[in-house]
Each structure stands twice: as structure tokens, then as C-alpha cells.
Amino acid sequence: MNPLKDLRASLPRLAFMAACTLLSATLPDLAQAGGGLQRVNHFMASIVVVLRGASVATVTIAIIWAGYKLLFRHADVLDVVRVVLAGLLIGASAEIARYLLT
């Protein structure tokens, strides 16, 4: 095999990649799709707000349920702890999403 022949065959591809790299380095606005990045950020921020609201509701319901079971049904503490821990883990999902998105 002739290495020069292989190089000549891939030369247009290398030139195209070099041109794309040069354009993306000099014109970063093209890479951001004309404001599309801000729309995605706004959408993700609204998802985080919804997750925070759901997490507050989930933790509140879990604690109310646990208190009801302990006070009125005389449930074992170990049975109630599982539900409270699950509620806290679900409630932490909004903050984990916030941490990953920022």
C-alpha cells in the first residue's frame, strides 16, 4: 500500500474538518444555535421548580403519614422509618437535579 495515496484520499476530509473547527472556534454564536441555549436553560429551570414543589409535598406527606401511624396506629418505628427515608430520598431529587444542572 502506498501511504501517500491514502493521505491524498483523506485530504478533502481533513480540510473539511479543519474548516469546521476553525469556524466553530471563531464563530461561537453558531454553536449556540441563536438563543436556543437560553430556552433550554429556562425549560430546565422550570423543571427544577416543579421538582422542588413535588419534593416538598412528598416529604410533607411522608412525615404526616409517619406521625399518623406512630400516634394512632401504634406502628413500629422501623416500619415508619422506611417511609420517611424514602420520602426524604424522593424529596432530595430536586436538589440533586439542581446540583447537576448548575
UniProtKB/Swiss-Prot annotation:
Q: How does it sit in the membrane?
A: Multi-pass membrane protein
Per UniProt, subcellular location reads as: Cell membrane
Identify one Gene Ontology CC term for this UniProt entry. plasma membrane
- Bilayer-spanning residue ranges: 47-67, 77-97
**Signal peptide positions (record):** 1-33
According to the record, what induces this protein's expression? Cotranscribed with ptxABCDE. Activated by the two-component regulatory system BvgS/BvgA.
Q: Which UniProt keywords apply?
A: Cell membrane, Membrane, Signal, Transmembrane, Transmembrane helix, Transport
Tell me yes or no: is Kinase among this UniProt entry's keywords.
no
Read off the Pfam families from this record.
TrbC (PF04956)
Q: What does this protein do?
A: Component of the type IV secretion system ptl required for secretion of assembled pertussis toxin (PTX) through the outer membrane.
Q: Mostly located where?
A: membrane
Q: Which InterPro entries match?
A: TrbC/VirB2 (IPR007039)
Keyword Transmembrane helix attached: yes
Q: Which family does it belong to?
A: Belongs to the PtlA family.
Task: Give the protein's recorded name.
Answer: Type IV secretion system protein PtlA
- State which gene encodes it: ptlA
Q: Which domain of life is it from?
A: Bacteria
